[in-house]
Regions:
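Short, solvent-exposed coil/turn segments
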Residues: 1-3, 32, 47-49, 62, ...
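Hydrophobic ligand-binding cavity/cleft-lining segments
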Residues: 1-44, 167-171
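Terminal "cap-and-tail" regions of soluble proteins that handle hydrophobic small molecules
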Residues: 3, 7-11, 61, 97-171
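Anionic, Ser/Thr-rich low-complexity intrinsically disordered regions
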Residues: 5-6, 36-40, 56, 79-82, ...
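Amphipathic alpha-helical interaction elements
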Residues: 19-22, 57, 129, 133
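Conserved short hydrophobic interaction patches
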Residues: 23-24, 72, 143, 147
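Hydrophobic-ligand binding "helix-grip"
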Residues: 28-29, 58-109, 113-115, 170-171
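Short, hydrophobic/aromatic-rich segments at coil-to-beta transitions
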Residues: 45-53, 72-81, 153
């Protein structure tokens, strides 16, 4: 099983970064790793126990995954695990922790565990899968950083107008 923890400095508050990832109408504007994400039941953002279906983007369009949220504590922590399997993953789990950064902005701490399958080929494919997953994760959060650099004020204005009745704590 491959495990990693990557820290990404972000140019916005924990609240803004959390919402830009978990509210799908924001995420669709920057996340080219995923072409489509939808929560069972159509909610605009997750909650504990919510299941999402995601389809890969770009060269990874053939990949799809269903995940269940095991933690959702806006704006500090979200964690999910894969439901079932989705080649090349036999197991996948990740968490995103958000902390305020000294001097402004925040830190997004992304931790993941992945296991590649099938089991008989794990020794061969898991190092490759881990390398590609890590590289795509770094690119993905660099795109989020660029989006936040240009649009954090727009997200903050939306947060002030949105009552949050459907997704956790009011803003």
């Amino acid at each position: 099983m491959a495990h990693d923890r990557i820290i990404f400095p972000m140019p916005a508050s924990c609240e803004v970064v959390f919402d830009v990832f978990h509210y799908h109408h924001w995420r669709a504007r920057w996340d080219s790793l995923v072409s489509h994400t939808e929560l069972d039941g159509g909610a605009p953002c997750p909650s504990v126990g919510a299941v999402s279906a995601s389809t890969g983007g770009g060269l990874l369009r053939a990949l799809s995954m269903r995940t269940e949220f095991v933690s959702y504590q806006r704006p500090r922590l979200a964690a999910a695990r894969m439901v079932g399997t989705s080649f090349p993953f036999s197991r996948w789990a990740a968490s995103m922790k958000h902390e305020r950064a000294a001097g402004g902005g925040s830190l997004l701490i992304y931790t993941y565990n992945i296991e590649a399958g099938p089991r008989l080929l794990r020794w061969l494919i898991e190092p490759v899968v881990h390398h590609v997953f890590r590289r795509q994760t770094v690119k993905r959060f660099a795109r989020m950083h660029a989006f936040l650099s240009a649009h954090a004020a727009e997200v903050e204005a939306w947060q002030r107008a949105y009552h949050g009745a459907r997704c956790g704590d009011p803003l």
